[in-house]
């Protein structure tokens, strides 16, 4: 028989830098999960990744206080910032551009993120990522 699911916890944790401090500690403590066990397992899985990369994690908490977790790829904004070389997005969207990304870079990001997005084709994913780029204040050029 399958374990009874008690709930889900969604977090964004820096790769290789999971600590029992907030936001991880309180989120897992509420569900009665072993915080250090998660931190060690997460840090071990993300050891080969670039340290500090934000990794979205979905933790499935079970009624017997055990858990499993699934890691996703970093957010689109992380890839766009890296591709354009900016530190943060525009303060006000639609009032000029603070950087540029090429359609080739957008397509490359779309190919990476396709499993995490709710679309079937790379073209649809590229369109979504272009919209994210524009809302961050990035100009999409040929």
Curated annotation (Swiss-Prot):
Classification via SUPFAM superfamilies: Ribosomal L11/L12e N-terminal domain (SSF54747), Ribosomal protein L11, C-terminal domain (SSF46906)
Any single Pfam family the record assigns to this protein: Ribosomal_L11_N
SMART domains: RL11
A GO cellular component entry from the record: cytosolic large ribosomal subunit
InterPro entries in UniProt: Ribosomal_uL11, Ribosomal_uL11_bac-typ, Ribosomal_uL11_C, Ribosomal_uL11_C_sf, Ribosomal_uL11_N, Ribosomal_uL11_N_sf
CDD domains: Ribosomal_L11
GO biological process: translation
Posttranslational modification: One or more lysine residues are methylated.
The entry's keywords: Methylation, Ribonucleoprotein, Ribosomal protein, RNA-binding, rRNA-binding
Molecular function via GO: large ribosomal subunit rRNA binding; structural constituent of ribosome
Function: Forms part of the ribosomal stalk which helps the ribosome interact with GTP-bound translation factors.
HAMAP family reported in the protein's UniProt record: Ribosomal_uL11
Quaternary structure and partners: Part of the ribosomal stalk of the 50S ribosomal subunit. Interacts with L10 and the large rRNA to form the base of the stalk. L10 forms an elongated spine to which L12 dimers bind in a sequential fashion forming a multimeric L10(L12)X complex.
PANTHER family: 60S RIBOSOMAL PROTEIN L12 (PTHR11661), LARGE RIBOSOMAL SUBUNIT PROTEIN UL11M (PTHR11661:SF1)
Similarity comment: Belongs to the universal ribosomal protein uL11 family.
Protein name: Large ribosomal subunit protein uL11
Top-level taxonomy: Bacteria, Pseudomonadati, Pseudomonadota, Alphaproteobacteria, Hyphomicrobiales
The gene coding this protein: rplK
């Amino acid at each position: 028989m399958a374990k009874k699911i008690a709930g889900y916890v969604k977090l964004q944790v820096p790769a290789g830098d999971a600590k029992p401090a907030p936001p991880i500690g309180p989120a897992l403590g509420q569900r009665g999960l072993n915080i250090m066990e998660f931190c060690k397992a997460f840090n071990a899985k993300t050891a080969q990744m670039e340290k500090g990369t934000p990794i979205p994690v979905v933790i499935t908490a079970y009624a017997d206080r055990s858990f499993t977790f699934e890691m996703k790829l970093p957010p689109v904004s992380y890839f766009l910032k890296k591709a354009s070389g900016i530190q943060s997005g525009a303060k006000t969207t639609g009032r000029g551009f603070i950087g540029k990304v090429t359609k080739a870079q957008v397509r490359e990001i779309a190919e990476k993120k396709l499993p995490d997005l709710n679309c079937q084709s790379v073209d649809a994913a590229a369109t979504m990522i272009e919209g994210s780029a524009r809302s961050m204040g990035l100009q999409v050029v040929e």
